[in-house]
Structures are given as structure tokens and as C-alpha cells.
Amino acid sequence: QVIAITGSASGIGAA
């Protein structure tokens, strides 16, 4: 599982 910055509420998501 790779952690990447996304446009989610927390700004962090699992890619």
C-alpha cells in the first residue's frame, strides 16, 4: 500500500 497526497478532506490518502 502506497501513501500518497490526494484531494481528500485530510489531504492524505492510500493509493
From Swiss-Prot:
Record has Transport as a keyword: no
A GO CC term assigned to this protein in UniProt: cytoplasm
Record EC number: 1.1.1.50
Reactions mediated catalytically: a 3alpha-hydroxysteroid + NADP(+) = a 3-oxosteroid + NADPH + H(+); a 3alpha-hydroxysteroid + NAD(+) = a 3-oxosteroid + NADH + H(+)
Highest taxon of the lineage: Bacteria
Molecular function GO labels: androsterone dehydrogenase (B-specific) activity
Function: Along with the 3 alpha-hydroxysteroid dehydrogenase and 3-oxo-reductase activities towards a variety of cis or trans fused A/B ring steroids, it also reduces several xenobiotic carbonyl compounds, including a metyrapone-based class of insecticides, to the respective alcohol metabolites. No detectable activity on testosterone, progesterone or 3-oxo-desogestrel.
Similarity annotation: Belongs to the short-chain dehydrogenases/reductases (SDR) family.
Name of this chain's protein: 3-alpha-hydroxysteroid dehydrogenase/carbonyl reductase
